Amino acid sequence: MTVQLRVYVPPHPLIKHWLAVARDAATPSVLFRSAITELGRWLTYEAAREWLPTEETTVQTPLEICPATVINPQVPVAVVPILRAGLGLLEGAQTVLPLASIYHLGLVRNEETLEASCYLNKLPEKFDPQTRVLITDPMLATGGSIMKAMSELTERGVDPSLVRIVSVVAAPPALQKLNAAYSGLIVYTATIDETVNDQGFIVPGLGDAGDRIFGT
């Protein structure tokens, strides 16, 4: 039986708070950047559940030896920010995954076709098949960028079931495309909005995340 895409909207008050700050058109760039960083932190924390590789061991407490669970250092963990807006979530994600390798992927969207093309690719030629990959992309709108990113990753040996996507706002077109192409994929997002307009922006959304992060 095919496992469908799973989308989680964590009911965490800090996620809700920082989403409200990010949505507000009056939020200045410096505060918007902080909001996206915090969303990256808390959404990555949620995404790491039952995803980070662990192993059983023992530790010596001041009193006696006891069983313990630790992160398995032998299994690679990678974060792939989709440039440029994905960089906004990266700092928060790194506070949760400080030892993860960072592989930048630069994608640009054709404003007429809404299709994505790659202008920067720092992915390795091949990933270890056990690699856990976290993709950061604030807006999952039409699905062009995230589908291109998934294509680049799976071509290099990444198992879609070991991928976690962290976004701030997701919309049905992107989620439907992911569901049709990749079984077992899991998305963590602060909210799901219903509409994408003719320009490919999520409505109500939060505007152009990249422009607001970088003040351009």
Curated annotation (Swiss-Prot):
Q: In which pathway does it act?
A: Pyrimidine metabolism; UMP biosynthesis via salvage pathway; UMP from uracil: step 1/1
Residues given in the record as 5-phospho-alpha-D-ribose 1-diphosphate binding sites: 84, 109, 137-145, 208
Q: Which cofactor does it need?
A: Mg(2+)
Positions that bind uracil: 202, 207-209
CDD domains from the UniProt entry: PRTases_typeI
* Catalyses which reaction(s): UMP + diphosphate = 5-phospho-alpha-D-ribose 1-diphosphate + uracil
What activates or inhibits this protein?
Answer: Allosterically activated by GTP.
This chain belongs to which protein, by name? Answer: Uracil phosphoribosyltransferase
Q: Which organism is it from?
A: Nostoc sp. (strain PCC 7120 / SAG 25.82 / UTEX 2576)
